[in-house]
């Protein structure tokens, strides 16, 4: 019998935005400069990285 595949849980798109008191939505994550708006970078301890294209920015 084949082993079952593990399904990775991705964050909901609504969790990546914050809404202020006036009702304006802003992003809580950094957008990838290569991929453009809508593709967010993951925040790690020492870097920001894009999961789509692999672009990485190191924290100072």
Swiss-Prot record:
Cofactor binding summary note: Binds 1 zinc ion per subunit.
Keyword Ribonucleoprotein (UniProt): yes
Keyword Ribonucleoprotein: yes
Domain of life: Archaea
Zinc finger C4-type: from-to: 32-53
GO CC terms of this entry: ribonucleoprotein complex; ribosome
Family label: Belongs to the eukaryotic ribosomal protein eS31 family.
Matches recorded under HAMAP family: Ribosomal_eS31 (MF_00777)
Subunit structure: Part of the 30S ribosomal subunit.
Protein name: Small ribosomal subunit protein eS31
Organism of this sequence: Methanocorpusculum labreanum (strain ATCC 43576 / DSM 4855 / Z)
Gene: rps27ae
């Amino acid at each position: 019998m084949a082993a079952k595949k593990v399904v990775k849980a991705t964050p909901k798109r609504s969790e990546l935005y914050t809404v202020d008191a006036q009702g304006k939505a802003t992003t809580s994550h950094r957008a990838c400069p290569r991929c453009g708006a809508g593709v967010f970078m993951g925040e790690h301890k020492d870097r920001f990285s894009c999961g789509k294209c692999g672009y990485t920015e190191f924290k100072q």
